[in-house]
Design a protein with these regions (language model features):
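Structural signature of extracellular appendage/secretion-system components
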Residues: 1-580
Length: 580
């Protein structure tokens, strides 16, 4: 992409590679959702099997207790019960205790009773529906009739990987491992899209586009402008000759300046060369005059910035990557800004510990006319605030810092009906509390950029150019080097710290591979311990083949000796008869 004869092909390969990367991330997200659906089906099957085994063990308990009371042999029923318990222990970790009457009681490792003299069954409202869902119901323990018909709840539940066994592993996958991977994939996409768009918005195509049409920001014209630094808005001819320009120093504007004030300043500065408008949360600038185009450039000495990104990138005027569900930049909202949500709109927030167990949840209910700071206060005063602190960082992102004892705790937002001033942007997308709201699901490289390499903005505006002089050059590909440099630079990923795209992706995929390897090792270790326990049990209470073989040899020798004695006695008897 540096001006060689093959630069168009190189640009085409680059844009195609970016789209392929986005497609791969989207496919991974789809695969994760599919896996969660498969795991959910297995959860349902496992619950049904556990219930069947508990019922079987309960029936055999009665048989063994009755036979014990009558002094009868219990071997057959006890062996069947042991087989059922062994199968149950593979599905869930249990503690089994023998009782004086011959029965056994069964508890989970956390002490929840599954079986004593009264049968209990697991109640799972979801029934193992084979679809990925934002949240899943708890598995409740209920008293049950001998027939298996469920009654009242015991008040105990199975809700995390701590239950152990196959069921615990499934819950860990469904509620922790897979959602965490998906959330981190969203963070990776956020960093990638912000880096790519930072470079594309700093450049321009030659000829420049007749209009720059921004994406949805979630803002309205009366919102605080919030920019520092300066930017240049210009109009050029198709060959890059400057027609008009205006430099806006945001720092010199009043402290209470609004987005509408910026639009007014742009229009006044360009003197009819172009028309800017801000409608329904989107900024657009359209050149006036046939063949003219629009350029927005950063001031090199004092670049414009809100939430750490320039004015063109913030409004998405020249993005390379777009998403219909996210603005792809931090909001830049401050505590005193209006949150823009209406009474009756809500967002459900769930907090889970490092094992995936839901600790608590809260439904955020903003009041009309409130501020972003009010949202922070409401969350800190909620049950969620008992487990950590909410705050707003300098880029307008909501942050949650769990208490030290809850390291690894995560938040999720299963449902969100909020809508900031009717723009279609809600609490989740505006404040970026989790990476799951990154907009990855419908992101893409702009179709016109994919279709035509010349639509990728690689040229840089000559800030000191005067009207009538060349401000853009057709052979200028400085943006190509900028893409390389930006993708290799350190990025601010919010709660996930500052790192490079390469390092973050390597850690993410490496962590997934490591967890898979550890899970396999744990499986092998558990299988070895199980086999050892079974062998020791069988040696103690079952048939030891070596010992029995030795006994048979002794018996055979005894039989042979007895046979010889009998044979000798027979011969003596015959001799006596002959003597008579």
């Amino acid at each position: 992409m540096t001006g060689s004869q093959s630069s168009a092909q190189t640009v085409a390969v680059f844009t195609s590679d970016v789209q392929d990367a986005i497609d791969s991330m989207q496919q991974l997200q789809t695969d994760v959702d599919g896996l969660r659906g498969d795991v959910e089906s297995e959860v349902g099957y496992s619950v049904d099997k556990i219930n069947s085994l508990l019922k079987r063990i309960h029936e055999l308990n009665g048989t063994v207790a009755s036979a014990t009371g009558l002094g009868k042999n219990i071997g057959g029923a006890a062996d069947q019960r042991m087989s059922a318990i062994e199968e149950l222990s593979g599905l869930i970790s249990v503690n089994v205790r023998d009782q004086p009457d011959g029965r056994v009681t069964i508890e989970t490792v956390n002490g929840a009773v599954l079986l004593d003299k009264k049968l209990r069954q697991l109640s799972y409202a979801n029934g193992g529906a084979s679809a990925s869902q934002p949240t899943y119901p708890n598995i409740d323990i209920r008293f049950a009739e001998d027939s298996g018909a469920m009654g009242a709840a015991t008040g105990e539940k199975l809700d995390s990987a701590a239950v152990g066994g196959k069921l615990g592993g499934l819950l860990d996958l469904r509620d922790r491992a897979l959602p965490a991977f998906s959330e981190q994939m969203g963070v990776l996409f956020s960093g990638l899209s912000e880096a790519l768009n930072a470079v594309s918005n700093a450049g321009s195509t030659v000829p420049p586009p007749a209009s720059l049409d921004g994406r949805q920001t979630g803002l309205v014209g009366s919102d605080r402008l919030g920019f520092t630094g300066a930017a240049t808005f210009a109009v050029t001819k198709a060959d890059g000759t400057l027609v008009a320009k205006t430099s806006i120093d945001f720092g010199a504007m009043p402290a209470n300046a609004t987005i509408d004030d910026m639009v007014t300043a742009i229009n006044a500065g360009l003197g009819g060369g172009a028309t800017a408008s801000f409608t329904d949360g989107k900024l657009s600038i359209k050149a006036n005059g046939a063949g003219n185009g629009v350029v927005v450039a950063q001031n090199e000495a004092n670049p414009s910035a809100r939430a750490g990104v320039g004015v063109s990138q913030y409004f998405g005027l020249n993005d390379m990557v777009r998403s219909d569900s996210n603005s792809l930049v931090p909001s830049g909202l401050a505590a005193g800004d209006a949150h823009g949500f209406a009474t009756g709109e809500t967002a459900q927030i769930v907090l889970r510990d490092a094992t995936g167990r839901a600790l608590t949840s809260y439904t955020l209910s903003p009041a009309t006319g409130g501020t972003v700071g009010d949202l922070v206060s409401e969350l800190n005063a909620s049950p969620l605030g008992d487990f950590g602190d909410f705050s707003l960082d300098d880029r307008g992102r909501m942050r949650f810092e769990p208490t030290g004892a809850l390291s690894g705790a995560t938040l999720s937002i299963p449902s969100d009906s909020t809508d900031r001033f009717g723009t279609g942007r809600g609490f989740t997308a505006m404040l970026g509390l989790t990476g799951a709201s990154s907009g990855l699901e419908n992101a893409q490289v702009r179709p016109e950029v994919l279709a035509s390499p010349g639509k990728l903005p690689l040229a840089r505006f000559q800030e000191n150019a005067v009207v009538g002089a060349k401000a853009l050059g057709a052979g200028d590909t400085r943006g190509a080097t900028a893409f390389v440099d930006k993708l290799a630079s350190t990025l601010d990923l919010g709660k996930d710290g500052k790192t490079t795209i390469e390092r973050f992706s390597s850690l993410l995929l490496g962590r997934a591979g490591l967890e898979a390897s550890q899970a396999n090792d744990n499986l092998l270790d558990a299988a070895a311990r199980r086999d050892d326990a079974v062998n020791r049990r069988d040696s103690f209470s079952g048939v030891n083949i070596d010992e029995e073989l030795a006994q048979m040899v002794i018996l055979q020798n005894s039989y042979s000796a007895a046979a010889r004695v009998i044979s000798t006695a027979s011969e003596m008897y015959d001799t006596l008869l002959n003597m008579v």
